């Protein structure tokens, strides 16, 4: 494992000042070569200057180990997601989630992805794990989402799984209903009969409403290879607030790939230059 120190550089009154911001950042096995190491440092430093101009929020979801979380937060993601749905290969139990949440730096949002969770289980979860937002990703109704989120005093977002017969109008109707019950945003993901998410498949982005009363976060099939093309589409960019990716940055289910996380963020930053 390679460890190093990264310094933030400030310029004030004709002088440079160096402030240490990360110490002994681990680089996992996928980032052993010097070029990759230098690249990840450059991207982190580049994010310091690009972040204020890049208004597109980025969430990496489905973390199961601290090393992957360290890499993601160093790359400048806005939010990280932990999955509390046992059938998922990205599932983490309460003890693991508690440990992971303590490694996330300030100002990075921690999102709890739950699927049809009971209130007592959610209450226990939020008492033990430091979480910022609840992401309801199952069959929860707007009323159910509001009740559960209020019980634990958390903001919430809802995943809308887009079906083949959905239209922009039908999706907008769902968004309006979730807004009326207090949602902070919606994630548009691809519908599947066999899973509640993480399928790696795209849906028809032409179905995304033009004018949503809630922020829309795009998910479903995003990868480092296609995110640049997606974000170069100005009509699409006008509709979405951010992107949410899980499988597209993995080397196997539940295990993130440092190179793919780096490539995803690098391609986003290239679009916004």
Each language-model region and where it sits:
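Cationic, amphipathic, low-complexity segments that mediate targeting or membrane/lipid association
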Residues: 1-4, 8-26
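Short linear sequence motifs
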Residues: 3-4, 9-11, 31, 56, ...
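Short, positively charged and aromatic/hydrophobic N-terminal segments
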Residues: 20, 26, 30, 34-44
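Conserved N-terminal beta1-alpha1 strand-loop-helix module at the mouth
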Residues: 44-213, 217-218, 222-273
């Amino acid at each position: 494992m390679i460890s190093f120190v990264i310094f933030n550089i400030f310029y004030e009154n004709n002088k440079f000042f160096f402030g240490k911001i990360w110490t002994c950042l681990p680089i996992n096995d996928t980032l052993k070569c010097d070029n990759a190491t230098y690249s990840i440092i450059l991207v982190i430093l580049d994010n310091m200057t690009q972040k204020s101009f890049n208004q597109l929020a980025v969430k990496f979801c489905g973390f199961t180990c601290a090393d992957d979380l360290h890499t993601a937060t160093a790359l400048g993601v806005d939010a990280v997601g932990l999955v509390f749905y046992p059938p998922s290969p990205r599932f983490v139990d309460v003890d693991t989630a508690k440990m992971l949440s303590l490694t996330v730096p300030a100002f990075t949002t921690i999102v709890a992805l739950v699927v049809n969770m009971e209130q007592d289980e959610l209450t226990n979860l939020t008492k033990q794990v430091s979480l910022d937002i609840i992401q309801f990703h199952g069959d929860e109704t707007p009323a159910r989402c509001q009740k559960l989120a209020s019980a634990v005093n958390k903001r919430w977002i809802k995943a809308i799984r887009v079906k083949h017969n959905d239209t922009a109008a039908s999706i907008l109707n769902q968004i309006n209903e979730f807004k009326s019950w207090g949602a902070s945003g919606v994630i548009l993901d691809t519908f599947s009969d066999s899973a509640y998410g993480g399928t790696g498949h795209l849906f028809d982005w032409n179905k995304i409403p033009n004018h949503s009363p809630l922020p829309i976060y795009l998910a479903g099939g995003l990868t480092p290879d296609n995110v640049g093309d997606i974000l170069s589409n100005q009509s699409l960019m006008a509709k979405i607030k951010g992107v949410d990716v899980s499988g597209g940055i993995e080397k196997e289910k539940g295990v993130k790939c440092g190179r793919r996380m780096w490539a995803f963020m690098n391609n986003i930053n290239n679009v916004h230059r």
